[in-house]
């Protein structure tokens, strides 16, 4: 009887220790996921929206519906005759075509 009681106490101790370790692992994973989401949200706040100027930060455009916007540049001639480069965040034509196809696919199949 003493052996069964001792074995039961040992089993309960091991079970509680292992479950505490698992809970710590889950808590750590939750914290890591939360920090990752916060970092993504911060990056999203700092991004440049569609149709806004991205001349100084060409890789900082926000994400669109399916794809990230791309910084598209054009050369502009000022009134004084100087050529300057002006850039804006927008959707490239091949991304627009892909979004159109996906939209039709959703309407037909979805």
Swiss-Prot record:
GO cellular component, one term: extracellular region
Propeptide: 21-44
Principal location: secreted
InterPro entries to which the protein is assigned, alphabetical: Spider_toxin_CSTX_knottin, Spider_toxin_CSTX_Knottin_CS
Pfam families: Toxin_35 (PF10530)
Subcellular localization, as worded in the UniProt entry: Secreted
Tissue: Expressed by the venom gland.
Molecular function GO labels: toxin activity
The protein, known as: U1-lycotoxin-Ls1aa
Taxonomic lineage of the native organism: Eukaryota, Metazoa, Ecdysozoa, Arthropoda, Chelicerata
């Amino acid at each position: 009887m003493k052996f069964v009681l001792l074995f039961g106490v040992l089993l309960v101790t091991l079970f509680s220790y292992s479950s505490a370790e698992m809970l710590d692992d889950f808590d750590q994973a939750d914290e890591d996921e939360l920090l990752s989401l916060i970092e993504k949200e911060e990056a999203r706040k700092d991004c440049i929206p569609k149709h806004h100027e991205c001349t100084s930060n060409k890789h900082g455009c926000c994400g669109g519906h399916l794809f990230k916007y791309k910084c598209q540049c054009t050369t502009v001639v000022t009134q004084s005759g100087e050529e300057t480069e002006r850039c804006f965040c927008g959707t490239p034509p091949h991304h627009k075509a892909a979004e159109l196809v996906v939209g039709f696919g959703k309407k037909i199949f979805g």
